[in-house]
């Protein structure tokens, strides 16, 4: 079973309410992150990632109900992304390079984030977050991709201007078949 699904079992029941200030602070962090991605300010976005980041997007398969727990590939199995900081830095270099053909000319993206639910993490100063997302991407003249799904993040408080860093991101897309030509952008 997918580790982050087990980790996010905290969201099988309604989480305890958090202070409105914390809810607002985390939502503003996500809106800022989306703005950085939409504006292709990737170096600034990369600074939001923790040095020990795990960025994971499992493969989703359609399963019958009794096998629903096998719907997503797990850590260590095949995945669209299973990246640490070094892999993320390599992806960042590729999308900002003049020779990175998959993003030259650049995609136009819009990241929408909502339904932010927050629970205390296992460590003081960490929070488990579930959020819904839509990523709209237009590339070249007619290429259009829309992705919807859930992000399960672990955020850690830090002393930066944004107040948080992303320690773990698991992207659970609603599609089981990806029709896009590539996944050369960030969720």
Swiss-Prot record:
Keyword Oxidoreductase: yes
Catalyses which reaction(s): chlorobenzene + NADH + O2 + H(+) = (1R,2R)-3-chlorocyclohexa-3,5-diene-1,2-diol + NAD(+)
A GO biological process held by the record: 3-phenylpropionate catabolic process
GO terms assigned for molecular function: dioxygenase activity
Pathway: Aromatic compound metabolism
UniProt keyword list: Aromatic hydrocarbons catabolism, Dioxygenase, NAD, Oxidoreductase
Top class in the EC scheme: oxidoreductase
Role of this protein: Part of the oxygenase component of the chlorobenzene dioxygenase system that catalyzes the dihydroxylation of a range of aromatic compounds, including chlorinated benzenes and toluenes, and dinuclear aromatics such as biphenyl and dibenzo-p-dioxin. The beta subunit is not directly involved in the control of substrate specificity.
NCBIfam families: PRK10069.1
Protein name stated in the entry: Chlorobenzene dioxygenase subunit beta
Upper classification of the organism: Bacteria, Pseudomonadati, Pseudomonadota, Betaproteobacteria, Burkholderiales
């Amino acid at each position: 079973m997918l580790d982050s699904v087990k980790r996010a079992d905290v969201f099988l029941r309604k989480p305890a309410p958090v202070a409105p200030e914390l809810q607002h602070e985390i939502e503003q962090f996500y809106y800022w992150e989306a703005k950085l991605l939409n504006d292709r300010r990737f170096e600034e976005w990369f600074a939001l990632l923790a040095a020990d980041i795990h960025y994971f997007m499992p493969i989703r398969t359609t399963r019958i109900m009794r096998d629903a727990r096998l719907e997503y590939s797990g850590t260590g199995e095949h995945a669209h992304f299973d990246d640490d900081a070094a892999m993320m830095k390599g992806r960042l270099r590729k999308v900002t390079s003049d020779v990175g053909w998959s993003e030259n000319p650049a995609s136009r993206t819009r990241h929408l984030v909502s339904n932010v639910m927050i629970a205390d993490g296992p460590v003081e100063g960490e929070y488990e977050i579930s959020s819904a997302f839509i990523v709209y991407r237009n590339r070249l003249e007619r290429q259009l991709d829309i992705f919807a799904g859930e992000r399960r993040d672990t955020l850690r408080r830090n002393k930066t201007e944004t107040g948080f860093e992303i320690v773990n991101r698991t992207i659970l897309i609603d599609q089981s078949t990806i029709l896009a030509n590539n996944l050369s952008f960030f969720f």
